[in-house]
UniProtKB/Swiss-Prot annotation:
GO terms for cellular component: cytosol. This is Argininosuccinate lyase. It is found in: Cytoplasm. GO terms for biological process: arginine biosynthetic process via ornithine; L-arginine biosynthetic process. Pfam families: ASL_C2 (PF14698), Lyase_1 (PF00206). Keywords: Amino-acid biosynthesis, Arginine biosynthesis, Cytoplasm, Lyase. Its EC number is 4.3.2.1.
Length: 462
């Protein structure tokens, strides 16, 4: 590579070339070239506006459109030569365009700065990414609903403090995550409204002297409106931070599910098996089947948290308007996009590869007095105040624990010793099936309600 200062579009003011070290340090083309489609879309919309407003000739627009078609083909085919000397995706494309069509390429940047150009590219890129992520979330939620429907009546322990609490069904548990990822989708969709605002026209920071039509460009690019203040348009990245925060929240939900999958697959618990294609083995221990996918997703959650903190820290001390600091916004964004999209794709597939071991789940329900609350509720319905019922059942649990049995294995006389109101109908209450069936209301874990929730979930996805 040469070090000729005059090859830079901004070189006129400088008397010596940029050092090779500075070129490497300041160039972004190695990573921002992924926005080439967005850059070309933005440039074409800008060029059409310039021609419509009479700022450039119709012939110039035709040349620009012809040249951009060639550039597009070259990039798609891998023939395009990216140059570190040209710093970024914008100047690489503009330089090649100018080589192809001459002066028309030099006129493209009229009324525009790289400051509003890159802000537009990022917004286009994030809008496209949000649309992709929303499709992936929908596919993952659909897979969770399929699993919930299949296991709508499969009992398992519900936990608090990682202690057996009350019976739920595996289907009900999966639908909890369906709701969490639904809120994640809503956050992305809401963020999209603020992403879809056009910065072009802000130029470097103060607007432009040319008679531009920003609303026309916004319409061409499918934006919902324009950024109302030129300083704000080029300088802030709060929309990118908001997007990354949505990514962090989604990955937090992924991590919670991952933690449970890892625990449930442990032979000591044995609630599920994950299909072999999502697991790996050990280089030394032949028996191992490791849940690497959920473990790695759990680890990647911290990575996305880090990208969020990187962007927050990047922006916290910047004065208006644009500063070179903002070049550092792209790699955290790109990494968050890649991590979330890859994770959602694999989790949607993996959900269909989960096999539930219902026998182990039900066995676990006999080891933690899971129907103790049902016994307390039974006593309340017999006229006992809840606090008195709670205390009486606590004594019954202690007696069962000392005897080494679950509550249903206590005799009627043993139960009456702690709760005189108990009658023979109590044993129907103490079964797992009875406990589940009794919670028969919207949001409850009765199999009938889980199936109804599955039907509503499918309607929400349609």
């Amino acid at each position: 590579m040469t070090s000729n200062a005059n090859q830079y579009t901004w070189a006129g003011r400088f008397s010596e070339p940029v050092s090779d070290l500075v070129k490497r340090y300041t160039a972004s083309v190695d990573f921002d070239q992924r926005m080439w489609r967005q850059d070309i879309r933005g440039s074409l919309a800008h060029a059409r506006m310039l021609a419509k407003q009479g700022i450039i000739a119709a012939a110039d627009l035709a040349d620009i459109e012809r040249g951009m078609a060639i550039v597009t083909e070259e990039i798609e085919s891998g023939k395009f030569e990216w140059s570190l000397d040209l710093e970024d995706v914008h100047l690489n494309i503009e330089k090649r365009l100018t080589a192809l069509v001459g002066d028309a390429g030099k006129r493209l940047h009229t009324g525009r700065s790289r400051n509003d150009q890159v802000a537009t590219d990022i917004r286009l890129y994030l809008r496209d990414s949000i649309d992709d992520i929303l499709v992936l979330i929908k596919a993952f939620r659909s897979a969770l609903v399929d699993l919930a429907e299949k296991e709508a009546a499969t009992p398992m322990p519900g936990f608090t403090h990682l202690q057996v609490a009350q019976p739920v069904t595996f289907g009900h548990h999966m639908l909890a995550y369906f709701e969490m990822f639904g809120r994640d989708a809503e956050r992305y969709a809401d963020c999209r409204k603020r992403v879809a605002r056009l910065p072009l026209g802000a130029a470097a920071l103060a607007g432009t002297t040319y008679p531009i039509d920003r609303a026309y460009v916004a319409e061409q690019l499918g934006f919902e409106g324009v950024c109302e203040n030129s300083l704000d348009a080029v300088s802030d990245r709060d929309f990118a931070i908001e997007f990354t925060a949505a990514c962090a929240l989604l990955m937090m939900h992924i991590s919670r599910l991952s933690e449970e999958l890892v625990m449930w697959m442990s032979p000591r618990i044995g609630f599920i098996q994950i299909a072999d294609r999502f697991c790996t083995g050990s280089s030394i221990m032949p028996q191992k089947k490791n849940p690497d996918v959920p473990e790695l997703a759990r680890g990647k959650t911290g990575r996305v948290y880090g990208q969020l903190m990187s962007l927050l820290t990047l922006m916290k001390s910047q004065p208006l308007a644009y500063n070179k600091d903002n070049q550092e916004d792209k790699e955290p964004l790109f990494d968050a996009v890649d991590t979330v999209t890859d994770t959602l794709r694999i989790f949607a597939d993996m959900a269909g590869g989960i096999t539930v071991r219902a026998d182990n789940m039900k066995a676990a329900l006999t080891q933690g007095f899971a129907t103790a609350t049902d016994l307390a509720d039974y006593l309340v319905k017999k006229g006992l105040p809840f606090r008195d019922a709670h205390e009486a059942v606590g004594h019954a649990v202690k007696a069962a624990e000392q005897k080494g049995v679950d509550l249903p294995q206590l005799t009627l006389d043993e139960l009456k010793a702690f709760c005189p109101q108990v009658e023979s109908d109590v044993f129907a209450v103490l079964t797992v099936e009875g406990s589940l069936a009794s919670r028969n209301h919207i949001g409850g874990t009765a199999p009938e309600q889980v199936r109804a929730a599955v039907a509503r979930a499918r309607q929400r996805l349609s």
